[in-house]
């Protein structure tokens, strides 16, 4: 059997997010069908008027913040790619979401109550939060960011380093009068010292370190530019939760699952730190919050997908959910374990179809032609994936995107690789 062989054929630009075409053959960004070079100018005409299917509220949001909308669309495309990765071994593998352009919420499956619907909605909501919050921290959006805060933090860092240096000299018995002359690192590596440090009373500026701090390396404080997760959550909520009546079961489960997706991002924010000091030392650190890697977000939501709760709606039209006894696995999903809080779990209210055959009404492309693993007993095995129809063994040569990197805004730079391999294909 011939081993897979990859040959890089060259770089191609794969347009995502605010792009209309998946092919990109010119230098610059093809933003919504407009050929522009360099950083795009995202205006309401360039973004909003080319998006079909927007609600009135979404159109108002887009006109007010076209740059944030473009970032949200990029997050949606990232989420679709992650959805395809996480459900690659399932009969429904998110591929149909790509067929609905920039707004997959028009997809039939996202307007149903399946387990797959819940997972997809939560991942799309998480993608919007992640993309918008990250763009904010990079200063790419007019409505948020912290460039001014960065400059203020730089001044604070220089002052803090100076204080720590002077305290070091004080503890070492070095004359403060000669410290400024003998330590060029203070000015050469960290910019000019604040003017008031050259006064005749530098001791007045020193703030003694706490007694429990015995080493300068233990000193850290908040700084840098944290991802504006609150702004991302707010825009995701305003953008995605605005469809349908809140009393409709479809809308209520959608809003619930959107919230679960956003919560996974906020719950997994992590602290990132940077060292500051002379000559490569780490005299103290500034730290800020960053969003989790989106692969982690996808993996955590997949776990929730596998344990999603089957619910029914009370007939009181008051928005309350009840978990049903018995799920799609044929047994009570809560039996033998502590009852879970439904607020952090994905919920669904319709039993999923088998997705074996093409069925546009539920966005099923079927599994004919899908590659399966004949040695796997799982969902990706030929027995399950091919729905009992059997499989063929074929030698396949294909091209695929590889080594992709997302760039602001709004494209993905990929290499195109050629793959030749023997595969098992569902009949």
Swiss-Prot record:
Keywords: Developmental protein, Disulfide bond, Extracellular matrix, Glycoprotein, Lipoprotein, Secreted, Signal, Wnt signaling pathway
CDD domains linked to this entry: Wnt_Wnt10b
Cellular component, GO, one term: extracellular space
Cysteines paired by S-S bonds: 83-94, 136-144, 146-225, 273-287, 275-282, 356-387, 372-382, 386-426, 402-417, 404-414, 409-410
Entry comment describing in which tissues the protein is expressed: In the embryo, expressed in the developing central nervous system (CNS), with an expression pattern very similar to that of wnt1.
Name of the protein this chain belongs to: Protein Wnt-10b
Xref: InterPro entries: Wnt, Wnt_C, Wnt_CS
Gene3D superfamilies registered for this protein in UniProt: 3.30.2460.20
Gene Ontology MF term list: cytokine activity; frizzled binding
Covalent lipid sites (O-palmitoleoyl serine): 279
Protein task: Member of the Wnt ligand gene family that encodes for secreted proteins, which activate the Wnt signaling cascade. Involved in neurogenesis. Performs a partially redundant function with wnt1 in the formation of the midbrain-hindbrain boundary (MHB) organizer.
Signal sequence annotation: 1-28
Protein family (similarity comment): Belongs to the Wnt family.
Compartments where found: Secreted, Extracellular space, Extracellular matrix; Secreted
Gene Ontology terms describing biological process: canonical Wnt signaling pathway; cell fate commitment; midbrain-hindbrain boundary development; neuron differentiation
């Amino acid at each position: 059997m011939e081993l897979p062989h990859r040959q890089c054929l060259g770089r191609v630009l794969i347009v995502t997010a605010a792009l209309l075409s998946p092919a990109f053959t010119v230098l610059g960004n093809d933003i919504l069908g407009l050929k522009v070079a360099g950083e795009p100018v995202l205006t309401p005409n360039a973004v909003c008027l080319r998006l079909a299917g927007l609600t009135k509220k979404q159109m108002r949001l887009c006109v007010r913040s076209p740059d944030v909308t473009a970032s949200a669309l990029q997050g949606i495309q990232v989420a679709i790619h992650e959805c395809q990765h996480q459900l690659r071994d399932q009969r429904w593998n998110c591929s149909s979401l790509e067929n609905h352009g920039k707004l997959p919420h028009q997809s039939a499956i996202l307007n149903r109550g399946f387990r797959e619907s819940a997972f997809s909605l939560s991942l799309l909501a998480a993608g919007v939060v992640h993309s918008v919050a990250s763009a904010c921290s990079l200063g790419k959006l007019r409505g948020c960011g912290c460039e001014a805060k960065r400059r203020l933090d730089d001044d604070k860092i220089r002052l803090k380093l100076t204080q720590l240096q002077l305290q070091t000299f004080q503890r070492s018995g070095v004359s403060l009068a000669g410290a400024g002359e003998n330590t060029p690192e203070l000015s050469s590596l960290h910019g000019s010292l604040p003017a008031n440090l050259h006064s005749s009373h530098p001791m007045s500026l020193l703030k003694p370190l706490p007694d429990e701090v015995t080493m300068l390396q233990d000193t850290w404080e908040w700084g840098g530019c944290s991802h504006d997760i609150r702004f991302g959550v707010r825009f995701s909520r305003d953008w995605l939760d605005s469809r349908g009546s809140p009393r409709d079961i479809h809308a209520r489960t959608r809003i619930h699952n959107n919230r679960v997706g956003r919560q996974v991002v906020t719950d997994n924010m992590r602290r990132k730190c940077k060292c500051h000091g002379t000559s490569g030392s780490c005299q103290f650190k500034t730290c800020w919050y960053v969003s989790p890697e989106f692969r982690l977000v996808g993996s955590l939501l997949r776990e929730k997908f596998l344990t999603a709760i089957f619910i029914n709606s009370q007939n009181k039209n008051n928005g309350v959910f009840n978990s049903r006894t018995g799920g799609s696995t044929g047994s009570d999903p809560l039996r033998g374990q502590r009852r879970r809080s439904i607020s952090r779990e994905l919920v669904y209210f319709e039993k999923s179809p088998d997705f074996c055959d093409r069925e546009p009404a539920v966005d099923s492309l079927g599994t004919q032609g899908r590659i399966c693993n004949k040695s796997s007993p799982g969902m990706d095995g030929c027995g399950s994936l091919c729905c009992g129809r059997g499989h063929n063994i074929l030698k396949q040569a294909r091209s695929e995107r590889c080594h992709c990197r997302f760039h602001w805004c709004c494209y993905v730079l990929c290499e195109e690789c050629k793959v030749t391999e023997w595969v098992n294909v569902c009949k």
